[in-house]
Amino acid sequence: MFTMKHLLITTIAAVLLVGTASADSTHDTAEEGDIAAVKQHLAAGTDVNIKDDDKSGTVERLRKHGGNSVVAKEPMPEKLVVLTFDDSVASHYSVVRPILKRHEFGATFFVTEGFTFTSNKKDYMTWEQIKALHADGFEIGNHTRSHMGVTRDTLGRLPEEINYIARQCEAYGIPKPVSFAYPGNVIHPKALKMLKSLGIRFARRGGSPEFPYENGQGVAYEPGLDHPLLIPSAGDARPDWTLADFKRAVAQAGWGRIAVLQFHGVPDFDHPWVHTPPKLFTQYMKHLQEEKCTVIALRDLSRYVNHKNLPAEPFAIIESRKAKLGKKQAEIENTTK
């Protein structure tokens, strides 16, 4: 049985490991003795049905204070990773597909007809190739028709942008997408209700606004705290990434947190600022295998997460993380003066 001292030590260790863990996480509130907050997290859908050897030492306490209401069909694996690929890039079929099949990994491919999709088949997939990805068991997600950023000015066009991709999927025998990725990782509060009405269960954003967009850094998805239509990316791969950057993103998985990873082309000639070298991508996937990660598509989160249980304030966890990270950065700057 963990003492309070042991509980505090293990919780701090978990925060140090991931580097960006939220102070408002269910585990932290349990450690602080804030049982009311723990119950709120559980009601929102936090999965505490974790293996009994959970290193945070908080599982028993969570269950004691209302965790007997299981919110998902299956226990969450210790290292749960979601792979996502944006923009219908040709290399998704020619390079990514065989690598994922070799490792037997799941993944979501978010398709759009934006950019030069209709005329440039050197850099973008055909719908026949997208259909083949579906036939292989991968998820086809919605990334809007024109890769339209979701802003105040474009909200009115969002239903048709999403419905167009849904119709195209239907025409090629692909199920209507239930997962969505925000083009350009641009989010807007009023999009949540709209996405729900369009049948979207899970929506992935980037690592911003917690982190700047430029370096692709992000945070893990915390079910019950993060809204299922505002799922953050733990990492958004960039051409200057190293294996260490990828490992840092993956290491955030655990203790009830999920590492959702964002890729574009492998390679990506039309968007070189989000390009991933194939050789490095191969190393990334090997690392996931060596770490014995459970690697799934975004839709398959429904096996572990109840998408109908929502936090009271969708953006509260985002603001909390921003405040914590800002404080940490200020402390670092003060120590270097």
Over which residues does each language-model region extend?
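Bacterial N-terminal signal peptides
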Residues: 9-18
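Ankyrin-repeat boundary/"N-cap" motif
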Residues: 22-28, 42, 51-58
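C-terminal domain-boundary segment and adjacent tail
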Residues: 67-70, 117, 170-172, 202-214, ...
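Metal-dependent polysaccharide deacetylase catalytic core of the NodB/CE4 family, i.e.
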Residues: 80-81, 101-201, 207-232, 256-268, ...
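Leucine-rich solenoid repeat scaffolds
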Residues: 58-65
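Ankyrin repeat structural motif
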Residues: 34-43
